[in-house]
């Protein structure tokens, strides 16, 4: 199936080949764990078990940042696992969320009552909290503060629906914007990045909001089937009486109009994303931050004006994902990627769409931040004969390439709520 998908995109197959035979390690070098303590090795094992996609880019980070971000992720994964567990009563869950940051300093605290699939991070929380306390104090301070603020925010939305667009921003801030703020503060604390990266919380927040809104928009049907609703009522109520009505065939035109309005809302974060990424100096941090963002941009382009969002899963191609991962290693390339997908959306804007003028306006704003005539060499300048040869080689060796690393599949399905 992946081979068939590549027929119309031979440059993507070329990049699949490059990725499989060594390109992956250039973007995400393999981490040497031989010198780690047993408890830290356990933490990295949990990291790989709970999110292979994040594990790959976290383990590629330089120096002290690697362990700090690993522990940061696991602490928030434990907090998120508590929040997601519907078998825990609200009365019991609220104090747990409010006090979770204090458990970082209690060596024996663990939670054995979760039924969630990632419950090992709660059941063996003493191992995670031990490594948290082994971090430099400057990292502990950031992680504990973000954990405290996120726990308060999660508790607020336990029995509360997302009503207005302002509430949507607030919810996304608690579950993702704070992550962006925390990561930025860790980058600056490590001194691999300038203090401004950690101080500009508005743009760090936008990085998280853009990813979270993309997930929420793309996952409409999955969330509906799971009894979850994250689309803001202020928007969808202008089209239907119940959010679930968008899944009905007779409402598909209204559904797509609402979809386009929410995508237009999310696009407003891209100028902040460009500014944020342009400030980064460390290559491992840049890769860590840029790859999820370009994946999200490609995902929004795939979702825009697309009825499939309300009928099944919308995914970017594996070859497309690999190409993005290998290209998004510098700012000119990232700008070229953004330019490409903004043009793709722009040319698909229906004149009859209620949000069409707003969509065109924000894309015009984004264009002003990008280089003129952006074009990725890797996507444009391979000769047809050369690419045809690659495709012929593909037909003979595809079985070998089906062993492509699972990390690409995880990135295609970017993010978790």
UniProtKB/Swiss-Prot annotation:
Molecular function as annotated in GO: metal ion binding; squalene synthase [NAD(P)H] activity
Binding, Mg(2+): 80, 83-84
Catalytic activity: 2 (2E,6E)-farnesyl diphosphate + NADPH + H(+) = squalene + 2 diphosphate + NADP(+); 2 (2E,6E)-farnesyl diphosphate + NADH + H(+) = squalene + 2 diphosphate + NAD(+); 2 (2E,6E)-farnesyl diphosphate = presqualene diphosphate + diphosphate; presqualene diphosphate + NADH + H(+) = squalene + diphosphate + NAD(+)
UniProt key word Lipid metabolism: yes
Pathway the protein contributes to: Terpene metabolism; lanosterol biosynthesis; lanosterol from farnesyl diphosphate: step 1/3
A single cellular component GO annotation: endoplasmic reticulum membrane
Membrane spanning stretches: 284-304, 384-404
Localisation per UniProt entry: Endoplasmic reticulum membrane
Reported disease: Squalene synthase deficiency: An autosomal recessive disorder characterized by profound developmental delay, brain abnormalities, 2/3 syndactyly of the toes, facial dysmorphisms, low total and LDL-cholesterol, and abnormal urine organic acids.
PANTHER family: FARNESYL-DIPHOSPHATE FARNESYLTRANSFERASE, SQUALENE SYNTHASE
Entry protein name: Squalene synthase
